[in-house]
Amino acid sequence: MQKEESIYSLAFWLLCLSNFLFCASFSMIIPELPDYLASLGGREYIGYIIALFTLTAGLSRPFSGKLTDHIGRIPVMAFGSIVCFICGGLYPLIHSVQGFLLLRFFHGMSTGTKPTATAAYVADIIPESKRGEAQGGLGIFTATGMSIGPVIGSFLAEELGLREMFWISSLFALLSI
C-alpha cells in the first residue's frame, strides 16, 4: 500500500505564513486610510484611492504571472513583499494627495505580484492530486490575514498612532519575504 503524499511540508507552511503576513500588512491600513487622506486635504479622493489600489492589483496580475513564469516564483514574491514594505514605510512621509495616489498605485501593484507568484509556487511544490487542497489552505491564510489585518491596524492606530501603525504594517511586509 502506498503512503499518501502530504501537502503539509515546511515550504508549504512558510508560504502560508508569508501570505498571511503580507495580506495582514496591506489590509491593516485600510480602515485608517480615509481619515489619513482627509488629513492631507484629500477627502474627496477616498473613492479614487481605493479604486486605484484595487485596479492596479488586478491589472498587474497577468503581467506578474508572465513575469513569474519567466524569471521564477521566488524573485516575484520577494519583489511584491519589498514593494509593500517600502510603501508601508513611506505612508507617514507623504504629505500630498498626489504623493498618496502614486504610493497607492505601487502598493496596489505589490498586491498583484506577491499572491500571484505565491499561488504558482504552491502549485509547483504540491503533488498534482493535492493542489486544490493546498490552494484552499493557502486561501485560508490569505483570508485570515486580510480579515485580521484591519483589526490589528485599528488597534495599533488607536494605541500607538498612525505613523507607528504604518511602520508596523511595513514590518509585516518585510517579514513576509
Regions found by a protein language model. Give the residues of each.
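Helix-loop boundary and gating motifs at the non-cytosolic
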Residues: 8-48
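Helix-breaking motifs and short loop linkers at transmembrane-helix boundaries and internal kinks
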Residues: 72, 93-98
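Cytoplasmic helix-loop-helix junction between adjacent transmembrane helices
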Residues: 105-142
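Residue-level signature of mid-helix packing/kink "hotspots" within the transmembrane helices
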Residues: 54-62, 146-147
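C-terminal ends and interior cores of transmembrane alpha-helices
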Residues: 82-95
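Symmetry-related core transmembrane helices of the 12-TM Major Facilitator Superfamily/SLC fold
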Residues: 165-177
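Paired small-residue
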Residues: 98-106
